């Protein structure tokens, strides 16, 4: 396929048009008075959002050169989202400002490589200063503030803070769509996995359709159990103890299942069978987790263990087990604290090494089940469109909160970037390098300017006053007042601000050093001739 090539100024100008189209669509969402953007969906209702990365990913431009520019800035948003989970609009605004200012200077004859050096130098100083002014996050109230600012909703802030308090730093917080109108928090304490009872005849509470076992023994195996002869020795020992039994196996079927059900119905003893969670190697790991949590052993032929020679000493214990049609929850397992801690440390080590996002998510889930718990925020709304928008906002708030716990917080509303202004301005540089530093200085004003403009105010006036205010004092665009940002609860996670600045600078530097752009030539549609008449037909 034939290619079209553009060089130097012409290439950069074409890409800049794409950058501006994307950034202008994204930046209207910035700040407490930012607007929403409506995205068309081929199927179903349109998506209304103020999430920068969601908007950026949707934008495809017709001109291939403009599209390349737009895609570069979309990458800034995407990368910031991957690292910090929020701050994508800020990153886009910073990137647009750096590219725009940089291009003016390159057009005027500045050397792009010198400018790049200056940008990198300035960003390094700004990042160091951001880390220096960062404050660690303390207490439930601080967490609630970070979440409330990100989601623009105080109720959501309180929900996330409560969820984090209840599941701890190793816990997992997930989002689900609720059937109702309200957003609620549901916390599952203990080890829960997505497998229910094998037979509904095993239930003990017919109103709730669940089996509740108090102080049960827990048999854990990766085998398929079909013969009752294999289970008999261990069953007899459990019956003598007068305790119920939970069997976690690959499957329980045939004669074994029938015997368990008949004994349950006759009231001889209570046993509930559930299938083992997960698949393949993950199943083995999860069974081992359950064994460590309950103080039992996994009965597997890989270790030369057979079911029929199992004794009661190999079984796990728990204070309570609740089994529903779809879930099994083990509460208060009897495993030794040091064994559980060793397993947690092992999973943490795997988490640090893994490169797969999927594996990371699964390891995090396992860690939560062993260490903290799992909190589910059920998002409710009146319409499907509102539900999607609300879910995206809460997801951002959740990510922002995690980032804040990790690296601390700085003043929000673009104030933190303005607080590092003097440090960046003091950098000693000459020539094109000094120009690069000035480009960063102009760019770090941009978020404040944009937040003010979205609130219907003159951005330049706010920026100039901010330069004279003492550090930490900023402009609250929601109320129009000048306040101590951290005291007023207007905060941003340091990680979010830092990632936005670093990613914007990285893409801007690449953009300015571009000298040629190659794109596919659009194919001309040659109209195919119509079919000839078929004589005599009506």
Curated annotation (Swiss-Prot):
SUPFAM superfamilies for this protein: GroEL apical domain-like (SSF52029), GroEL equatorial domain-like (SSF48592), GroEL-intermediate domain like (SSF54849)
Keyword Nucleotide-binding: yes
Gene Ontology biological-process entries: protein refolding
Positions of ATP binding: 29-32, 86-90, 413, 476-478, 492
Localization terms from the record: Cytoplasm
EC numbers: 5.6.1.7
GO cellular component, one term: cytoplasm
Membrane-crossing residue ranges in chain numbering: none
Oligomeric and partner information: Forms a cylinder of 14 subunits composed of two heptameric rings stacked back-to-back. Interacts with the co-chaperonin GroES.
Family (UniProt): Belongs to the chaperonin (HSP60) family.
Record protein name field: Chaperonin GroEL
Lineage of the species this protein comes from: Bacteria, Bacillati, Bacillota, Bacilli, Bacillales
Gene, per the UniProt record: groEL
């Amino acid at each position: 396929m034939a290619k079209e090539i553009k060089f130097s100024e012409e290439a950069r100008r074409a890409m800049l048009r794409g950058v501006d189209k994307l950034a202008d669509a994204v930046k209207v969402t910035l700040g407490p008075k930012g607007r929403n953007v409506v995205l068309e969906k081929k199927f179903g209702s349109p998506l209304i959002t103020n999430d920068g990365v969601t908007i950026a990913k949707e934008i495809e431009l017709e001109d291939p050169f403009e599209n390349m520019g737009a895609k570069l800035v979309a990458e800034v948003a995407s990368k910031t989202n991957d690292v910090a989970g929020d701050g994508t609009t800020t990153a886009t605004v910073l990137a647009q400002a750096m590219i725009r200012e940089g291009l003016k200077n390159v057009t005027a004859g500045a050397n792009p490589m010198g400018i790049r050096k200056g940008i990198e130098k300035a960003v390094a100083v700004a990042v160091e200063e951001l880390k220096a002014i960062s404050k660690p996050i303390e207490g439930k109230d601080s967490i609630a503030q970070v979440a409330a600012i990100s989601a623009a909703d105080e109720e959501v802030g309180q929900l996330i803070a409560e969820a984090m308090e209840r599941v701890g730093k190793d816990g997992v917080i997930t989002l689900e769509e609720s059937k109702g109108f309200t957003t609620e928090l549901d916390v599952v304490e203990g080890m829960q996995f997505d497998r229910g009872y094998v037979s509904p005849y095993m239930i003990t509470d017919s109103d709730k359709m669940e089996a509740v076992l108090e102080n049960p023994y827990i048999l854990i195996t990766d085998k398929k159990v079909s013969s009752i002869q294999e289970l008999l020795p261990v069953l007899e020992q459990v019956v003598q103890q007068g305790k119920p039994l939970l069997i976690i196996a690959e499957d329980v079927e045939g004669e074994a299942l029938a015997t368990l059900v008949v004994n349950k119905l006759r009231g001889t003893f209570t046993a509930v069978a559930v299938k083992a969670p997960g698949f393949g190697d993950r199943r083995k790991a999860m069974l081992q987790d359950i064994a460590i949590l309950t103080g039992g052993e996994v009965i597997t032929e890989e270790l030369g263990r057979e079911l029929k020679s199992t004794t009661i000493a190999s079984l796990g214990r728990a204070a309570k087990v609740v089994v529903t049609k779809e879930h099994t929850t083990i509460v208060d397992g009897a495993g030794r604290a040091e064994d559980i801690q060793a397993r947690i440390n092992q999973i943490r080590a795997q988490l640090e090494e893994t490169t797969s996002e999927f594996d990371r998510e699964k390891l995090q889930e396992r860690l939560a089940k062993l260490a903290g718990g799992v909190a589910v925020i059920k998002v409710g709304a009146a319409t499907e469109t509102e539900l999607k928008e609300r879910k995206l906002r809460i997801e951002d708030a959740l990510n922002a909160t995690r980032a804040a716990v990790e690296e601390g917080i700085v003043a929000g509303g673009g104030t933190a970037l303005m607080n590092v202004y003097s440090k960046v301005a003091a950098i000693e540089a000459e020539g094109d390098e000094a120009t690069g530093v000035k480009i960063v200085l102009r760019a770090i004003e941009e978020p404040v300017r944009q937040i003010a403009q979205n609130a219907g105010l003159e951005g330049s006036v706010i920026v100039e006053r901010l330069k004279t205010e003492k550090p930490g004092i900023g402009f609250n665009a929601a109320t129009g007042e000048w306040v101590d940002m951290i005291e007023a609860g207007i905060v941003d996670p340091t990680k979010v601000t830092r990632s936005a600045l670093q990613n914007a600078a990285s893409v801007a530097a690449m953009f300015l050093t571009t000298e040629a752009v190659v794109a596919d030539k659009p194919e001309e549609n040659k109209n195919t001739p119509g079919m000839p008449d078929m004589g005599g037909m009506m």
